[in-house]
Amino acid sequence: MAPHILSAVTGNSVDVIKPVRALISVSDKTGIVELATYLSSIGCELLSTGGTAAKIREAGLVCKDVAEHTKSPECLDGRVKTLHPKIHGGLLAVRGNEKHEKDMKDNDIGVIDMTILNLYPFEATVAKGSPFEMCVENIDIGGPSMLRSTAKNHAYTTIVTSPSQYAELTDTMKSNEGGTTLALRKRFAARAYATSAAYDSSIASYFASQLDSEAPVAARVYQPEYPLKYGCNPQQKPAGISSILGSPLPFSVVNGKPGYINLLDAANAWQLVKELKEATGLAAATSFKHVSPAGAALAVPLSSSECQAFEISETDAASLTPSALAYIRARNADPMCSFGDFAAISDIVDEGTALYLKKEVSDGIIAAGYTPEALEILKQKKKGNFIILEATPDFVPPSMEYREVFGMAFSQKRNSIIVSADHMKESVTKRTVDDDVKRDMILGCITLKYTQSNSVGFGKNGQMVGIGAGQQSRVDCVKLAGRKVATFMLRQHPQVLGLNFKAGVKRQDRVNARVRYIEGDFTTEERVRWEANFEVVPEPLTSDTKEAYMKELSGVILSSDAFFPFRDGIDHASKLATKRGNIAERMQQRAHPSREEDGGINGIPILFRMRHFLEFKVIW
């Protein structure tokens, strides 16, 4: 049987409508007094309830109680306040419709031209871990009813659901002799229905979480925030970023125009440094490129050879702030790959950090905040186009994550586990693990949590010194990361530190020249260009020289975002150094072919971090 579809109800066709009566009922009272003052100034009668009415009267404004308007008192502990024909009749009446006008007159119903409301804070109540009964009590009934009535009749009535709309509302009214336009009413109605959908979705999801059965269909409502020039590629237009309705963005844009990949980098990089800070108590930084870290580090003092390799004087290094120290380590883990990076710093960015970042080629930064001096320095980068994002304080992401791919939506619980020293309590070996090693293991775990899978990383002295990301084979991850470890260490070799560059060779060119010197596999034409960097062309760095230097490598931890299915990855890792005491750290406990009876391979102890499986694979 076909459903009965209602016919349209006709009335007057009006663009600008000046409100004669507005109903105000808000839990978030931000800006409400100012808005009520304006409405009162244009002769609009104010109706309200409870705390909102009291707030308006405190400002010296006349406000009529809803109960007085309806001649029906609130009842049932306030559960019934506005569910009354004099409220919904006033909202739903079609102006100029003869039957509606007669019904209103017969029932003593006056028009209500505007509703300003917020819904009960259901999500906030749930987020606090409140009892089920309290959560149920914070499900709004009257609010959504008024919202839908007002939005349905948007041809004549205006629905306002957020303080963020107040400025647009008053600007429009001031430009139209105190009236709202049809275009604004329609736009606000769309926002209202989206708000209602998100609200009901959160209630449905919460109730589903209280059941043993699987969750019902979930509704997700997105609020466009920033248009983007294009997506991953120039042909992918239009593009933009949206917030999830009811939740703020995790950052604000302070300067510049971020792109699609910039924002992906920022979102992942910020989570990485925030978790590192929480887990270790140290300032943390990362250097991101294409949604994976090129480097990540903690504020651990630099050695003399590191200072030379990073082109920082020991005097300057001694006065570095934690933020600067962490970023200098992160940037110099793999400075060739960090060219044009997106930086993230867990702490406030100070002047010293900004001055260091100013001389590097970088696309942008996200941080906890900025001193005024640092902000002015960074705003000068890239001719004023340097991207500066400030993380939203105390932002809590939703517990569920969704991703749309090829017409499908994937969902999963957010990986909210933050690795800490508590996860390092059990070891297969009997060796004592000192705090510095645990610190580096935590660094490795959290870094790989935000690295494209498969991924393997090596850490040393509070710094990731080699990250192998996005390989199909785990042993290839080890090989890739291992090459980066060798390059990092050999950058501190006396022959490399002694390279005599010509005056005027740029910093990044010096970085690249050192890396190519270590690699040594030049084409004829490339060698000519490379030699042009030096006052005196250096002697080759021979394989024997490199091998002898690498034998001194020790204290390096190995992290993996999942278990090693074969021992070949560990075998290859052991080739990087012969000194015992290196740590191979795995992301889960599982019997596998690489495990030896003594709990180690080639002198590398294997530490199991958890009793239960814990993997941090990231696939975009």
What is each model feature region?
Residues G51-F122:
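Glycine-rich nucleotide/cofactor/substrate-binding loop typically near the N-terminus or early
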Residues P163-S164, E168-K229:
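Non-catalytic interaction/clamp surfaces of large macromolecular machines
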Residues K64-A67, T158-S162, L607-F608:
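Short acidic-hydrophobic, aromatic-tinged amphipathic segments that line or gate anion-handling sites
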Residues M146, N153-L169:
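Mobile "lid/hinge" segments at catalytic clefts and subdomain interfaces of large enzymes
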Residues V33-S40, Y120-I139, S145, A269-E278, ...:
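Short, hydrophobic/aliphatic alpha-helical segments
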Residues A2-H69:
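N-terminal glycine-/serine-/threonine-rich phosphate-binding loop
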Residues V94-A151, S427-D435:
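Active-site/ligand-binding-proximal alpha/beta "capping" segment
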Residues A2-L23, K29, C75-G78, D113-Y120, ...:
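ATP-dependent carboxylate/acyl-activation modules
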